[in-house]
Structures are given as C-alpha cells and as structure tokens.
Amino acid sequence: MLFTLLLSAAAVQASTRDEIERLWNPQGMATQPAQPAAGTSARTAKPAPRWFRLSNGRQVNLADWKVVLFMQGHCPYCHQFDPVLKQLAQQYGFSVFSYTLDGQGDTAFPEALPVPPDVMQTFFPNIPVATPTTFLVNVNTLEALPLLQGATDAAGFMARVDTVLQMYGGKKGAK
C-alpha cells in the first residue's frame, strides 16, 4: 500500500514538473524581470524571514517571494481558488498581489487592481491568458516564475510552490 502511494506521488510530481517546464520559458518569463507598479518602489524595508521547508529539505524564505494573481471577478474558477490562496497566504505568511482582467475583484481579493497592458506583456509573453493564473515573483530580483494556471486545492498549490522553488534553486545553483 505504501509503495503504491509513493509510486503515485512520484507520477504526480513528474507530471507537475512537465507542466511547469512547459510554462517555464528561459528566453521569456524566467529571465524577464517583472516591473513594479507605477508609483511603487522595488525596494522596501525587508520583512522578517518566513521560512518554508521544501520537500527536499532546503529552506526558503517566503518573505523573498510574492505571489502575483491574475483573476476575474466573474470567473467561477477564481471564486473557487482565490479563497484557498488567501487562506494559504495567511497560514504561511506570504503576500499576494492581485490583478484583475475584467476590472472586478471577488470576495477573497475585492481590491484587485486592473492589469495594465505592459504587465500583461511581461507576465504572458509565451503562455495563454487564463484565470486564475499565479506567478512567484522574487522581491529582490523581480524575476517572475510561472506557478499555476487554473484552480487547485491547498495541497496542490503548496506542492506546486515546492516544485517551482526546487526547480528555481536548481537553476540558480542553490542547495
């Protein structure tokens, strides 16, 4: 029974890695820094560390990362996913910056900002526009990493965060 669970977990992780690799484009998204919103500074006072242990044992400071959410107020998948994301942000202490494609927020993120065209070009150069879509943005370098398109549950989202941060660490030579 345990062997079957481990085998199925490995298959899920492999498909997750394949999906992330399709989203991750070294000539596009991964190497192109996101631009801060007009009137904001990329550098602010550094928050206290919020350590998150990855499944490979490595620790990552979630204070170095921000989740950027692209959503729509009338999207049923956003209504399903956004409360999950908000709860995870509160639980793990990461911050979420929400953009709306239709000018409307939802109950989880009622004050989402309308997305400017240049932000759309930065985040969606080679992937389809869909909602919800999330990216991890390194607050120190403004490097944006594609995270997920579509709704998922809490465990699925955190597993994706784990996988993306492991892949990022491997590409950067971190241990």
Region spans (language model):
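N-terminal post-signal-peptidase region of extra-cytosolic proteins
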Residues: 51-56, 79-82, 115-121
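Thiol-based oxidoreductase modules, predominantly thioredoxin-like and allied folds used
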Residues: 94-117
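Short active-site neighborhood of thiol/selenol oxidoreductases, capturing the structured segment around
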Residues: 59-75
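The canonical Cys-X-X-Cys-His
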Residues: 75-79, 134
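Typically the conserved alpha-helix immediately C-terminal to a functionally engaged Cys/Sec
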Residues: 79-92
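Extracytoplasmic/secreted cell-surface and envelope-processing proteins
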Residues: 78-79, 106-108, 144-146
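Structural micro-motif
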Residues: 120-136
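Non-globular targeting/processing and membrane-anchoring segments
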Residues: 3, 8-61, 138, 145-175
